[in-house]
From Swiss-Prot:
Residues 1-22 form the signal peptide. The lineage of its organism: Eukaryota, Metazoa, Chordata, Craniata, Vertebrata. It comes from the Eukaryota. GO terms for biological process: cell population proliferation; neuroblast proliferation; positive regulation of neuroblast proliferation. Coiled coil: none annotated. Increases the platelet count associated with splenomegaly. May have an important role in neuronal precursor development and maturation. It comes from Mus musculus (Mouse). Keywords: Cytokine, Developmental protein, Glycoprotein, Secreted, Signal. This is Cardiotrophin-2. Not detected in adult tissues. It is found in: Secreted. Belongs to the IL-6 superfamily.
Amino acid sequence: MYCLLATPLCLLSLLLPPLSPAAPISPSEPIGQAYSLALYMQKNTSALLQTYLQHQGSPFSDPGFSAPELQLSTLPSAAVSFKTWHAMEDAERLSRAQGAFLALTQHLQLVGDDQSYLNPGSPILLAQLGAARLRAQGLLGNMAAIMTALGLPIPPEEDTLGFVPFGASAFERKCRGYIVTREYGHWTDRAVRDLALLKAKYSA
């Protein structure tokens, strides 16, 4: 390192010992951050789903509405048996969660666009959808930090939506939004369980 002037920064750089590039990164901190965010997200998932349903009209807004049979091929389901879930390795657990929240960020953007057209006068719903998308993106970043700390490869980002039929009817768009907001809640619940397990395993 060449220093033409004896500036304070230059002198400081000469006095400080070099950083070791091989210093291990503890996963406990990013796991704790991700767990805290997932818990915060979990507190808001039911409100998001109920707000969404209330703005779609019948049958969505009818008391007790539920359609678990509705699924999207572009969005992985969070449903998994306890035995299968508990037997997962860390890499698989994190990879599946990251893939799901990547898909959710893209689907929440689509649902937000749909609702801007279907319910332009509903700022609360649009704000909640936008906040959910940003939190999902934040959790994605936390997941990537955990995988880096554990020395695991980070899956490349993919276009999970593919080609979206722009001619979808209003009812089809409402169904799509219902599935996305429902699965957002289910995946958040699963992420809390995933991260609680990792938190106990890698506690500082």
